[in-house]
Structure formats: structure tokens, C-alpha cells
Amino acid sequence: EVIASQPVDPDLVISTLTQPQFHGAAHMYQKHMTQHMIDVIPRDWMKTVTNVFLLRHPARVISSFSKKYENPTLHDIGFQKQIELFRFLLDAGHNPVIVNSHDIIRFPEKTLKKLCSHLSLDFDPVMLCWDIGGSRYDGVWAKYWYGAVHRSSGFSEPEGTLPDLPKKLQSLEKRALSHY
């Protein structure tokens, strides 16, 4: 369903991702997940955009991911690929921004102001809230992943302590921590 909903030709996708204006907008936000950044697709296009890495503690990623995938692997949760992509950009002379999801949730205004400043964008307080429900830009995967966001109208309360993972996932957390 997801693959059928959009182009699969890498050149066409890259062309869309790097066009100067998207639907007339001067700036375009793109969310990429590491499992979509497969090795056979060229990465040079990443050098033409500003990259921000949003990190989340491995225990939180694993806890969330394991609700959708029965036995997630280190490859599935993407920490190794994040390091690889980050190093690719460093080697190309870029200095990608790293934002920890904990900071956005705990200090949304402060964190977004810093991010906007780094990206040479104006901060607008409207960034701190949104209408409940989905967006036409969500994509077909929204019904699988965006339930909590669709029920919200702003940033949630700060996250509590790290989740206790089942024993079978604790070694995965330990391996992921070395890449975090």
C-alpha cells in the first residue's frame, strides 16, 4: 500500500525532494526514516539540502517500534544507519544539526527557537500547536504511525523515565546505545 502510493524511481524521488520550491513554498520539511535510505539509492542529493537528525533514546525507540514489529533488529531501528548518514555529511563538509526528541518535548519553544535560528528561519509560536487530526501531507502510513499525533494539538507532557524493556529486547538496547 505504501509503495503503491508514490513514485519508486529513485531519480524521480530525488528530483522531487530537491526541487527549489515545493508547491510554491520557500522551505520544505522532509521526514526520512533510516530504513528508507537504502544503500542502492544515491545520497549525493543530501548534500544539497540542510539536514537535521532527530534522535530518540534507544529504549524509547525500541519500546515504540516493538509495538508494530514483533522482533525489531538493530537494522530496523536505524541507529547504525544514522551514524553512517551523519558521517557521510560530515565527510562532505556539512555540519548537520542534531536534536534530541527529549529536548523538543521538554522545552519545545526553546528548542524550536534554537533550531530555527540554526536554519535561518523565523520562529513562529504557531509552531507549538496544531489542529487535532491528520493532514493531507501525512501519507498512507499515517494510520499506522501517527495516531498519537492526530489525537494531539501540541507537544505532550515531558516523557517520564525510560521504559523497562522486556529481557529479549535489552541486548538490542545495549547495542543501539553504542550508536546513540
Description of each model-found segment:
Residues 1, 53, 176-180:
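Generic hydrophobic, helix-prone segments enriched in Leu/Val/Ile
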Residues 1-42:
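PAPS-dependent sulfation machinery
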Residues 6-11, 75, 79-82, 108-112, ...:
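A structural signal for well-ordered alpha-helical scaffolds and beta->alpha junctions
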Residues 16-20, 64, 85-88, 168, ...:
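Residues that form generic nucleotide/phosphate-binding pockets
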Residues 30-126, 140-148:
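PAPS-dependent sulfotransferase catalytic domain
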Residues 122-180:
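PAPS-dependent sulfotransferases, especially Golgi type II membrane carbohydrate sulfotransferases
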